[in-house]
């Protein structure tokens, strides 16, 4: 239960946080209703298309890129952010942000002509919705624009091998 988790975190002097990917759908069901849209939009309506096909990140993670300019994506943002703020979350790690920068056939907003323009619009919307109610940390995000978050992860995941340790230390020192 989320609310019990949040309460317990705060009782221990910790700040509760949650993880999300606002511009990615991991399910791949293009006929599924988008959360927060009351059935008005399906994932097939809000997914970006490249050469007419739903856009996925190359390499096998299978996340489908969502159009940051689409009203359905923005309604989904409202649905989750409003719920999490009401619940008492204070930290939000948002990941796989590069999906929001994909170059696509087109975007919902016809004024948008590049992936970075779409990303800027979606991130401004998300940032404005959150306001100062949560600390936001970006992962797998473009270095610039950087104004939409309080922090960012500076390297990818590491594990227990010596090569991972070298990678983490190299990232920590910015390749010095």
Regions found by a protein language model. Name each.
Residues 3-14, 123-131:
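Surface-exposed amphipathic alpha-helices with a cationic face
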Residues 1, 58-76, 98-118:
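The substrate-binding groove and active-site-proximal loops of carbohydrate-active enzymes
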Residues 21-25, 97-99, 139-143:
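Active-site beta-loop-alpha junctions enriched in small/polar residues
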Residues 68-96:
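An active-site-proximal structural segment forming one wall of the substrate-binding cleft
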Residues 1-3, 14-16, 21-24:
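Glycan-recognition patch characteristic of GH18 chitinases/ENGases
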């Amino acid at each position: 239960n989320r609310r019990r988790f949040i309460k317990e975190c705060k009782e221990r002097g910790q700040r509760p946080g949650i993880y999300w990917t606002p511009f990615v759908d991991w399910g791949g069901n293009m006929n599924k209703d988008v959360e927060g849209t009351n059935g008005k939009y399906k994932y097939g309506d809000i997914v970006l298309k490249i050469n007419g096909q739903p856009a996925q990140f190359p390499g096998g993670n299978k996340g489908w890129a969502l159009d940051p300019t689409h009203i359905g994506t923005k309604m989904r943002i409202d649905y989750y952010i409003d719920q999490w703020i009401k619940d008492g979350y204070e930290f939000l790690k948002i990941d796989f942000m590069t999906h929001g920068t994909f170059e696509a056939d087109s975007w919902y907003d016809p004024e948008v002509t590049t992936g970075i323009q779409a990303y800027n619009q979606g991130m401004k919307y998300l940032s404005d919705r959150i306001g100062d109610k949560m600390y936001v940390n970006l992962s797998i995000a473009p270095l610039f624009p950087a104004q939409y978050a309080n922090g960012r992860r500076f390297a990818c995941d590491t594990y227990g091998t010596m090569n991972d340790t070298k990678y983490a230390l190299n990232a920590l020192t910015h390749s010095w």
